[in-house]
Regions:
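Short cytosolic juxtamembrane segments of multi-pass membrane proteins
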Residues: 34, 115-130
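Transmembrane alpha-helical interface segments in multi-pass membrane proteins
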Residues: 5-23, 27, 34-81, 95-110, ...
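Conserved activation segment
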Residues: 93-94, 124
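Interfacial loop-to-helix junctions that mark the boundaries of transmembrane helices
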Residues: 89-91
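Membrane-interface helix termini and inter-helical loops of multi-pass transporters
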Residues: 81-87
Length: 130
């Protein structure tokens, strides 16, 4: 029971760090893509459209990270079972599914600030700044 709680705590910390990393990547993307966002707004994209674009990007980043994490975890479990056959190194299906869902939710929540920042950009200012 203590081991389960410890692993759960480590997983929670990992998800918090992952959320912060997704938010930082998205904030950098907003900064680097100011002109692109300005151009989209200049040709008629609404703030909602811009927000949706950044949410979609965050979902894809989070999904890719979740799937990669799942695959690496399965591979690590396999290696552990091969090295120590008597050790039950496997994750229940519900835990794997929950991990992927929580990773997606974390990514979406972490993208709220960057998506809002991108949606608030003014087209003229975004296109004129260097």
């Amino acid at each position: 029971r203590a081991l389960t709680l410890a692993v759960g705590g480590i997983a929670a910390i990992s998800l918090a760090v992952a959320g912060i990393l997704v938010m930082n990547v998205m904030l950098i993307a907003v900064t680097q893509r100011r002109k692109e966002i300005g151009l989209l707004k200049a040709i008629g994209a609404t703030s909602t459209d811009i927000r949706r674009l950044f949410f979609a990007e965050a979902i894809w980043l989070s999904f890719a990270g979740a799937v990669l994490g799942f695959l690496l975890g399965q591979f690590g479990s396999l290696l552990l079972r091969l090295a120590y056959p008597q050790l039950p190194a496997w994750a229940p299906v519900w835990a794997s599914i929950a991990g992927i869902i929580v990773a997606l939710i974390t990514g979406i929540l972490a993208s709220i600030l960057p998506a809002s920042k991108a949606a608030r950009l003014d087209a003229v200012q975004a296109l004129s700044k260097k």
